[in-house]
Amino acid sequence: MRIISARSGAKSIIAEKTFTGTVHQDPVITDQDDIKINTVIFTPCSRTYWHFHDNGQILQVFRGKGYVCGKDGVPRVITEGDTVYIEPGERHWHGGTQDSLMGHTAITLGGTTWLEEVSEADYAAAADAD
């Protein structure tokens, strides 16, 4: 058993490399090969690049409204209280809506493979779904 203390006073990481827009990341567990837990805040219009996880991912939305888009290319709106399970190997992206930030806890199982940036057209399709 491990108890991970809160990051009292620690600054959030501004994630840039595989994200579009301003994304704040607070690592919870990052030192395990098989599981990573991050608290993430997406500002409006910010999002991940397309990516997939070896053993899947669980997103628990705790604030705001966002989008998640999977292999079918159909963006879905997610809101506070929603939980998303992303299958192992499923290509996807997630982020804030055009007018709302979105905060979630991401539990990532296994490794992550990052792909291309989400195009403005793909993101605009998400706004149409809203």
What role is predicted for each listed range?
Residues 1-35, 114-130:
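A short, N-terminal "cap"/entry segment at the start of jelly-roll beta-barrel domains
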